[in-house]
Amino acid sequence: MYQSLMTVRETQIAIKEVKTFFEDQLAKRLELFRVSAPLFVTKKSGLNDHLNGVERPIEFDMLHSGEELEIVHSLAKWKRFALHEYGYEAGEGLYTNMNAIRRDEELDATHSIYVDQWDWEKIVQKEWRTVDYLQKTVQTIYGIFKDLEDHLFEKYPFLGKYLPEEIVFITSQELEDKYPELTPKDREHAIAKEHGAVFIIGIGDALRSGEKHDGRAADYDDWKLNGDILFWHPVLQSSFELSSMGIRVDSKSLDEQLTKTGEDFKREYDFHKGILEDVLPLTIGGGIGQSRMCMYFLRKAHIGEVQSSVWPDDLRAACKKENIHLF
């Protein structure tokens, strides 16, 4: 039966250790400045992240003006807008401590309706919009993960070390070709188990089979220049996503992707106009799950062991039977 390596109190202390170390190194190595993040945005701005395009944001109206607002799903679009508004230049970037509510999340060991992540974004030049630049950025972030594991091992040697020296890169099409008989999720399990750490490139567009590896909104990532960082989780014995990131759409890729998804109505939103008219800067960015990080590096079996959220009674009871104590 599962046995946590730390008490609840010890876990809370270690969570701070994980978050403080990672935040400090992320800012230094990617040259990012921390900024304040919104909890909600106006509906008409188009700044909310609509994820896979089907999740419903929490909406409410403001007493003062009656304007419709939405609780953010993530800050994927807001960050790009903020870089423009704050006057950042190529090579400069920002990050935020993002908190969100995703009401339509399907709850399980790795998913909660409460989302906390380091949301970051950086301005790039046109010639940097390449797979090579994407991979170099992934390697920088992976280096932070490696150093975090070493740092924790010095304080908590019983946590062990599992990450390989290097992260492996593979495209979603190469992954389908390698495991044509498997579902996309099972492909992720297979490749993560084989290598320990992998970055899957190119998520959102249809593969040669006609199926997508996974869904992605049409208006933030360029589907050819994005991907997910996956580790093999030693406790769950499955693939485990730590980050979704990518080079963002330019006017050409946004135009193509909105057409593919049948979302031409979004062309009238301020954010989308800013990209189509080349007003907003070209960027790269992503979200790095804070609870996901804590869950992996503290070797936890459930995300509820590292964050406070609301869980159905039947799920709490099932966890208790498995010796999993939720916050």
From Swiss-Prot:
One of its GO terms (biological process) is L-asparagine biosynthetic process. The gene is asnA. It is found in: Cytoplasm. One of its GO terms (molecular function) is aspartate-ammonia ligase activity. This is Aspartate--ammonia ligase. It catalyses: L-aspartate + NH4(+) + ATP = L-asparagine + AMP + diphosphate + H(+). It comes from Bacillus cereus (strain G9842). The keyword Magnesium does not apply. Transmembrane segments: none annotated.
